[in-house]
Amino acid sequence: LLGIGIGAPSVNEQNQATAHAANLNWNSGLDIINELHEIFSVPVKLTNDANLWVLAHQQFDQTLLSDFFVVTLGTGVGAGICCNGSLLKGREGFAGELGHVIAQNSGRSCSCGRKGCLETYVSANGLIRTVQSLIAQCNNYTGPLLDLSVCNLSAKMIAELAISGDEIATKAFNLTGQILGKALANMVALFNPEIISYSKETVIMEECCLSLPEQFAEIKR
């Protein structure tokens, strides 16, 4: 073993430790580097997981793109940004915290302490919250989602129901795609990328992307 590289959310590049990760049960910064170094006695490096996707593109993608960004979507939302061939980290390494840009003023409460963050709408948990909201608004819905508790709901399950034509699941994905499309269009305006890439950590992105071309076209108009 020559070394260990770790991708994690909410990484402070200055002190090489995780800060408060809103979607993980960590009450304070976790000193992963020293803990692993004591066990394995090899160099340990830590960076944001979305940044590693950028580095992977640069290492293995033969197209040699110099301007692009990668979107990670799971329990949270993140972005790794490459500008002029260089990974954009920011002062402390928190550049690309796409999930915590505001998608809706005074919107849903986020685990980071703010309201209306993008990931409260387009992450896996955000999709589930949208389904719950739609069911509460629809008095005549009689589909299978009525019989499922929050604990038993998953993004994959909602996607399967949307594919089968379930009214609530389909509407939830459409709404999620609209919000995600606007956020990505804003990223395009800011960074002028050659491509947008995404990690397939969850079924959400693949399903939402079906509606993204329409959202981009609407924004351009």
Language-model regions: role of each:
Residues 8, 73, 124-125, 200-201:
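Short secondary-structure boundary segments
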Residues 42, 46-50, 103-139:
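Glycine-rich phosphate-binding loop plus the immediately following alpha-helix
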Residues 119-195:
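A mobile "lid/hinge" subdomain adjacent to the ATP/sugar-phosphate binding pocket shared
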